[in-house]
From Swiss-Prot:
Pfam families: SRP9-21. One of its GO terms (biological process) is negative regulation of translational elongation. Belongs to the SRP9 family. Keywords: Cytoplasm, Ribonucleoprotein, RNA-binding, Signal recognition particle. The keyword Iron does not apply. Its main location: cytoplasm. It is found in: Cytoplasm. GO terms for cellular component: cytosol; signal recognition particle, endoplasmic reticulum targeting. This is Signal recognition particle 9 kDa protein. Heterodimer with SRP14; binds RNA as heterodimer. Component of a signal recognition particle complex that consists of a 7SL RNA molecule and six protein subunits: srp72, srp68, srp54, srp19, srp14 and srp9.
Amino acid sequence: MVYIASWDEFVDRSVQLFRADPESTRYVMKYRHCDGKLVLKVTDNKECLKFKTDQAQEAKKMEKLNNIFFTLMARGPDVDLSEVTGKEQMETQPAKKGRGRKQ
């Protein structure tokens, strides 16, 4: 098991690991509320990558990693990931205009 200190390196190596063997690669999140620690693990039974954090800002990055993995799983491992971000997907939803009754 390898703990990776840099978030960007963890994401890059995780995507490479998934693209190398998409059938057996899995992604696990574990959160311990009493410690406030989040551990992300990506493994393909040969190599195991781990990232540990206790920073709340990393939760937003975790959502982006989820979107990346969902895209890779749904569209295939050869998809271009340059357009995958959490903000762009959220902005495409139509905005609600009011709280009142529809007329």
